[in-house]
Regions:
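Cofactor-binding active-site loop characterized by glycine-rich and histidine/acidic residues
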Residues: 13, 20-127
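N-terminal capping segment at the start of a domain
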Residues: 2-16
């Protein structure tokens, strides 16, 4: 599956912005998902790159990227049934949730993608 092409199709059809965020994140998310264990979880802290997450969930978990976008919009909302483990959009929130989930269950790996802009948020430094 060509993830960038899928992003372009869904973004064009739904008149979405943030293409730079989608395209710069999708290969990282794809690599993480390709190495994840069955009990591992992934949290996208930079929620504005949601479409990149949705196409990876389509590739690895059989979800429909466009249906996820229509349900959640441009920022993911917590939906564990669809393997979205944190509502993101407020910068810095995802890392805090990922840290909490990792501490709560040491047997499961928690992967999180944080954007550069988030690193200026106080919650990142507190986590």
């Amino acid at each position: 599956m060509n993830l960038k092409k899928r992003i372009a199709v869904v973004a064009y059809k739904n008149k979405l912005g943030h293409l730079g965020s989608y395209f710069s994140s999708v290969e990282i998310i794809d690599k993480i998902y390709s190495k994840m264990g069955k009990d591992d979880i992934f949290i996208l802290s930079s929620g504005h790159a949601a479409l990149a997450l949705y196409v990876c969930l389509e590739k690895y978990k059989g979800k429909d990227a466009e249906a996820l976008f229509l349900k959640h919009g441009g920022h993911p909302h917590r939906d564990e049934e669809n393997e979205i483990y944190c509502s993101t959009g407020s910068l810095g929130l995802g890392l805090c949730v990922a840290l909490g989930r990792a501490v709560a269950n040491f047997k499961r790996k928690v992967h999180v993608l944080v954007s550069d802009g988030e690193c200026a948020e106080g919650s990142i430094w507190e986590a």
